[in-house]
């Protein structure tokens, strides 16, 4: 009986890998074409960065805390969208240092990343966090994800021909490119040693923003690697939809559906994050990282990022890194029995990954801009 169960489990694992490999081989456009398409999709006129520093003060253990904002874009109503930034850095200046950007999840804010900013600053790096669109200081006084859900609902209801925002990931991706413009101007930052680490929503923003921007030398998308297409096709969309359930319920009502279902998700996602079910899905985007150091951190039981879909993305990344002769620069860690959570062991893995790949500058400078 025991041998039979073991054989069955092994067979299921084998066929799961075969299915992932088959889906990973799904023909996506070449990486350069995907990169160009995403840049074009999100493009908008740049405005001067206009950094405005609001605070520089001593922090714990001889560290320095900075708070500032930068300009990201001029919106359709003429208002300048500004990105709030929190930085923790070593007190000593002189030799340019590595910098790590940390991104929070849905309903969070930059303050939730302070422990990471302090951790990397103690390692001699500069830590930076931002508030995503409609989060933190950008939520208009709302708490959690309320303003974010309202913004996505409003974006869903925009009529054809009217200005269309993309608060569901894409607009924050643009902000991150502007943050990279800013850090590239700081004399205390080594532009060859910039990393991006994101959790949940922030992880998705990481594999979108950093995939197409070579200025990000090292990336860690945590509890975020998945396949949106697989989740929808296999009726496993619920975890992702529930992170912004109010927007999905509004879309269901507008579409005349009694409840949120696959059709609602498909129509909503195609409008507010166009391309996420096709060329901009995670299995396609991870190919663009090769051969930069990429650490993927996932949970075996994560309902937001079903493992079966995540394996498709894993396989796509493994193939791309193999073809680039850089398999040693890709690491995938799946925590057994863990849902949508980063374990203490995985946190140490992230810190060690940053130290490993940011200690020594690369010889080739990054491309300017995206």
Question: Residue ranges of each PLM-predicted region?
Answer:
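The conserved beta1-alpha1 loop
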Residues: 88-89, 97-105, 298
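Cap/lid segment of the alpha/beta-hydrolase catalytic domain
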Residues: 101, 106-174, 228-235
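Primarily recognizes the serine-hydrolase "nucleophile elbow" in alpha/beta-hydrolase
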Residues: 177-246, 275-277
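Mobile cap/lid helix-loop segments that gate and shape the active-site cleft of serine hydrolases
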Residues: 218-285, 306, 310-314, 320-327
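C-terminal catalytic histidine-bearing segment of alpha/beta-hydrolase fold enzymes
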Residues: 251, 314-369
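Short beta-strand/loop motif that positions the catalytic acidic residue
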Residues: 289, 296-298
């Amino acid at each position: 009986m025991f041998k039979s169960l073991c054989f069955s489990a092994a067979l299921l694992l084998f066929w799961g890998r075969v299915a992932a490999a088959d889906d990973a081989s799904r023909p996506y456009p070449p990486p350069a074409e995907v990169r160009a398409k995403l840049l074009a999709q999100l493009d908008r006129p740049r405005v001067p960065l206009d950094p405005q520093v609001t605070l520089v003060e001593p922090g714990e253990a001889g560290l320095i805390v900075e708070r500032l904002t930068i300009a990201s874009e001029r919106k359709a109503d003429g208002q300048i969208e500004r990105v709030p930034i929190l930085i923790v850095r070593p007190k000593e200046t002189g030799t340019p240092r590595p910098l790590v950007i940390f991104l929070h999840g849905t309903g969070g804010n930059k303050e939730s990343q302070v422990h990471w900013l302090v951790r990397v600053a103690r390692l001699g790096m500069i830590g930076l966090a931002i508030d995503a669109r409609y989060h933190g200081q950008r939520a208009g006084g709302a708490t959690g994800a309320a303003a974010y859900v309202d913004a996505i609902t409003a974006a869903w209801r925009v009529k054809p021909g009217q200005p269309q925002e993309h608060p569901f990931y894409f607009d924050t991706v643009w902000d991150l490119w502007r943050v990279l413009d800013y850090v590239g101007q700081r004399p205390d930052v080594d532009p060859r040693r910039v990393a991006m680490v994101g959790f949940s929503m922030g992880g998705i923003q990481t594999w979108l923003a950093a995939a197409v921007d070579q200025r990000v030398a090292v990336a860690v998308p945590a509890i975020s690697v998945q396949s949106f297409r697989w989740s929808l096709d296999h009726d496993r969309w619920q975890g992702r939809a529930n992170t912004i359930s109010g927007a999905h319920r509004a879309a269901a009502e507008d579409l005349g559906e009694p409840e949120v279902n696959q059709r609602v998700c498909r129509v909503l996602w195609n409008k507010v994050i166009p391309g996420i079910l096709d060329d901009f899905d995670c299995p396609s985007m991870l190919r663009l990282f090769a051969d930069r150091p990429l650490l993927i951190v996932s949970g075996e039981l994560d309902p937001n990022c079903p493992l079966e879909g995540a394996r498709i993305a894993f396989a796509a990344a493994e193939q791309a890194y193999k073809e680039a002769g850089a398999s040693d620069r890709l690491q995938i860690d799946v925590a057994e029995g863990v849902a949508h959570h980063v374990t203490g062991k995985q946190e140490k893995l992230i810190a060690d990954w940053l130290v490993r790949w940011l200690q020594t500058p690369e010889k080739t400078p990054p491309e300017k801009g995206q």
